[in-house]
């Protein structure tokens, strides 16, 4: 039974390892969507944020609602 347990543990680690690596490579807050993040980035000014993760922070700092269409324009 000993060797079987070792093999089972190794199998679990091998399956889980890629998922753990993916989670580590994407630190910081998660955006609702990349489109929303980019729109917020444009509203704040492109120079404010250069990376995807920083765009999320930029959107939060900017405190602006993402623009999705003409329906958001008053008087139209």
UniProtKB/Swiss-Prot annotation:
Disulfide bonds join 31-62, 40-58, 44-56, 49-59. Keywords: Amidation, Antibiotic, Antimicrobial, Disulfide bond, Signal. Coiled coil: none annotated. The amidated form is probably the active form. It comes from the Eukaryota. The modification Proline amide is found at residue 74. Residues 1-23 form the signal peptide. GO terms for biological process: defense response to Gram-positive bacterium; killing of cells of another organism. The keyword Nucleotide-binding does not apply. Belongs to the paralithocin family. Has antibacterial activity, mainly against marine Gram-positive bacteria like C.maltaromaticum (MIC=25 uM), C.mobile (MIC=12.5 uM), C.divergens (MIC=25 uM) and C.funditum (MIC=12.5 uM) but also against C.glutamicum (MIC=12.5 uM). Has very little or no activity against Gram-negative bacteria. This is Paralithocin 3. It comes from Paralithodes camtschaticus.
């Amino acid at each position: 039974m000993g060797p079987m347990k070792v093999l089972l543990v190794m199998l679990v680690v091998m399956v889980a390892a890629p998922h753990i690596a993916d989670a580590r490579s994407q630190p910081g807050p998660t955006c609702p969507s990349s489109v929303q993040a980019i729109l917020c980035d444009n509203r704040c000014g492109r120079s404010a944020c250069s990376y995807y993760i920083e765009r999320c922070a930029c959107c939060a700092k900017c405190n602006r609602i993402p623009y999705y269409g003409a329906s958001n324009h008053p008087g139209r």
